[in-house]
């Protein structure tokens, strides 16, 4: 069995946020708070249940055609971790015990 691991580039500045989410996950928190992007109105906080996050992680895993026999994956997170895309990369790494390496997002799409 492999274990989750997070690593960070020297210019990544959201390590405190990542560590907070890791702690929540590892202590079996059932609710997680994320801010919406604010693309259609003012950003707001939303609550996401652990079960919903696991469901999403499992569906993404299946959609990408990953095999359960793979005992370790490493992923690079270059998305803002406080937004949905980067946050879900972190959740998938936690759920599947992957190694995730964070670098700062350098562009805003």
List where the protein language model places each region.
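Short coil/turn segments at secondary-structure boundaries
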Residues: 44-48, 61, 65, 77-81
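Short, charge-rich binding segments
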Residues: 38, 62-71, 82-83, 91-94
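Conserved AMP-binding A3 loop
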Residues: 31-58
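AMP-binding/adenylate-forming
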Residues: 50-55, 74-109
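Conserved pre-ATP/AMP-binding loop-to-beta segment of ANL
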Residues: 17-35, 68-73
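Conserved ATP-dependent adenylate/AMP-binding module captured primarily in the ANL superfamily
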Residues: 1-14, 54-76, 107-109
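Glycine/alanine-rich phosphate-binding loops at beta-alpha junctions
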Residues: 6-16, 20, 39, 43
